[in-house]
Amino acid sequence: MVKVGIFGATGYTGVELIRILSKHEKVEIKYLSSQSYNTKAISDVYSSLIGFCDKVLEEVDFQKAMSECDVIFTALPSGHASKIAREAVKKGVKVIDLGADFRFDDYSVYKEWYSGDYEDYGDIKRVYGIPEIYRDDIKEAQVVGNPGCYPTSVILGLMPLLKNGIIEGNIIVDSKSGVSGAGHNPSYNNMYAECNENIKAYNVAKHRHIPEMEQELSKIFGEKVSVVFTPHLAPMTRGILSTMYCKLKKDMDVNTVYNIYTDFYKNEYFVKVLKPGNYPATKNVYGSNFCHIGFEVDKHTNTLIVMSAIDNLVKGASGQAVQNMNIMFGIEENTALDIVPIYP
């Protein structure tokens, strides 16, 4: 059994980890930390977990967690995971960070976009955790930086096109996200009266996920990729729908595009390519680790329009983290993740 610890167990990504791991046949949850709810059972905080995980939440104790666990998931604000990872690596404990601490190749880019006085993690060997790209590296990894939710939807949506050199490197991305993407802590923008019957753009042209997208898309393309990104908050709990506008280098019909995608993702269980004329919807991936991809060719402007849908808390966060854990420990990749989406 793989012994697991979670720092930040009562945030949305933390409790989603527990939901998934509680049904994992090769995992034992050994340690859960929470600054807000320590000494309470997790099932007293989230009654959805009654009978599935009733473990008592503890104060943050790095040494205790490292002595009890084979892998630690960190679902903490930026800047905390690097301190934990440095000690964990020395003790042979693996770390999967759901924050942004280990997503960037260049620490200076991280520091520029994520304000704060963070510890330089440049000496910590880490792998960016998209299995569809870095599976072999993840197998050997000690530290994995779990991708952001928006970048996951965008990278999976664009990878076949960039890998095959079909599109130009200037891409426009429009994404809609459920409110859970903003986290568990209450804020003005997350209030019911602000979100209900309302959709609004935020952090236009300055969202923190932009450099993460550009870093990975540029590596796939082999040259610089520029992303114009506009995220929106949609009146739903879960889900991300990303629409990407790409200039084709030559004329191409939708059936040719479909064949490129199906060939590229033929061995990827969690990526589903929809037939021409069918478009992704967040409802069709709700509660699952799947990514649905669809597309259309606008012949009038020679633009390829790609759409991808994920559940931001599963494939966009905790599900992908468990997928990475499975790979790191040689467990079948879809263990505990073979979840049929909830519909309607």
Swiss-Prot record:
InterPro entries: AGPR_AS, AGPR_type-1, NAD(P)-bd_dom_sf, NAGSA_dehydrogenase, Semialdehyde_DH_NAD-bd. Pathway: Amino-acid biosynthesis; L-arginine biosynthesis; N(2)-acetyl-L-ornithine from L-glutamate: step 3/4. CDD domains: AGPR_1_C, AGPR_1_N. GO terms for molecular function: N-acetyl-gamma-glutamyl-phosphate reductase activity; NAD binding; NADP+ binding. It comes from the Bacteria. SUPFAM superfamilies: Glyceraldehyde-3-phosphate dehydrogenase-like, C-terminal domain, NAD(P)-binding Rossmann-fold domains. Its main location: cytoplasm. The active site is at 149. Keywords: Amino-acid biosynthesis, Arginine biosynthesis, Cytoplasm, NADP, Oxidoreductase. Its EC number is 1.2.1.38. One of its GO terms (biological process) is L-arginine biosynthetic process. GO terms for cellular component: cytoplasm. Pfam families: Semialdhyde_dh, Semialdhyde_dhC_1. Gene3D superfamilies: Dihydrodipicolinate Reductase, domain 2, NAD(P)-binding Rossmann-like Domain. It is found in: Cytoplasm. Belongs to the NAGSA dehydrogenase family. Type 1 subfamily. This is N-acetyl-gamma-glutamyl-phosphate reductase. It comes from Thermoanaerobacter pseudethanolicus (strain ATCC 33223 / 39E).
